[in-house]
């Protein structure tokens, strides 16, 4: 892997991990349309850890608050919200492997992501969500968690689904986004742990270590930038802007699928 490839892959992962456009969906699209090979597993794990650093930097105040008061309501909400994704990853992941080979699945899922983003914005403007952590119920956390679990389908954005679910549930706009990003921490850590055994097998070539440093660093920087962009758009009620992007990419994806 070259340094340029590492930079591009890190940037794409950092941006699409947090922008509501589906990182897994874009990976499938790039592999099919641009014939880009899937990166080595070790690189993939390290890049995901780079995005984890971005979350820690962006939300350190929230994380530090949880560490100081681990039994606060936000902690319990995050635990409850992670349960559906944990069950889905453990029980259903093998059944979704073929979805990562299908442009049709990605195209349809991107259409659904766009609809979800647009719908949530319209609903949130009608009921003016004001729920902060203390007012958010465990049923709200489960609902958000279920949407996160469904994002195992490539093309269905994890960040988009969880933010949209929070808005639909009546959460305060900024808290909905913060909760979504904090909810990504256990998911990213869990995915990294799940792949660690294979990482020890593949390893890193001693003469090719620089790309494995540049990739995660790039992912962290672009991931932090993406988080700030999403937070700003959510505050201003402009999340639905990404709906149009998802629909355009979905149209291109389905067109390419029909050509095949």
Curated annotation (Swiss-Prot):
Pfam families: BacA. InterPro entries: UppP. Keywords: Antibiotic resistance, Cell membrane, Cell shape, Cell wall biogenesis/degradation, Hydrolase, Membrane, Peptidoglycan synthesis, Transmembrane, Transmembrane helix. It is found in: Cell membrane. GO terms for molecular function: undecaprenyl-diphosphatase activity. Coiled coil: none annotated. GO terms for biological process: cell wall organization; peptidoglycan biosynthetic process; regulation of cell shape; response to antibiotic. Its EC number is 3.6.1.27. It is a multi-pass membrane protein. This is Undecaprenyl-diphosphatase. The lineage of its organism: Bacteria, Bacillati, Bacillota, Clostridia, Eubacteriales. The gene is uppP.
């Amino acid at each position: 892997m070259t340094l340029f490839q590492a930079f591009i892959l890190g940037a794409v992962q950092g941006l699409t991990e947090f922008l509501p456009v589906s990182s897994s969906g874009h990976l499938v699209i790039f592999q099919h349309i641009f014939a880009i090979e899937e990166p080595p597993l070790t690189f993939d794990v390290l890049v995901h850890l780079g995005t984890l650093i971005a979350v820690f930097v962006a939300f350190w105040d929230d994380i530090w608050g949880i560490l100081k008061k681990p039994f606060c309501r936000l902690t319990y909400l995050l635990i409850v919200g992670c349960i559906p994704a944990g069950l889905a990853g453990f029980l259903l992941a093998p059944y979704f492997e073929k979805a990562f080979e299908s442009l049709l699945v990605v195209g349809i899922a991107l259409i659904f992501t766009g609809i979800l983003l647009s719908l949530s914005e319209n609903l949130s403007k009608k009921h003016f969500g004001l729920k902060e952590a203390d007012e958010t119920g465990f049923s709200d956390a489960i609902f958000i968690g279920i949407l996160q679990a469904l994002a195992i389908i490539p093309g269905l954005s994890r960040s988009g689904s969880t933010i949209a679910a929070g808005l639909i549930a009546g959460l305060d706009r900024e808290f909905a986004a913060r909760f979504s990003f904090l909810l990504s921490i256990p998911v990213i850590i869990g995915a990294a742990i799940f792949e660690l055994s294979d990482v020890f097998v593949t390893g890193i070539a001693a003469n090719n270590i620089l790309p494995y440093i540049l990739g995660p660093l790039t992912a962290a920087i672009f991931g932090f930038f993406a988080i700030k962009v999403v937070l700003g758009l959510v505050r201003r009620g402009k999340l639905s802007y990404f709906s149009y992007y998802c629909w355009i990419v979905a149209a291109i994806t389905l067109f390419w699928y029909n050509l095949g």
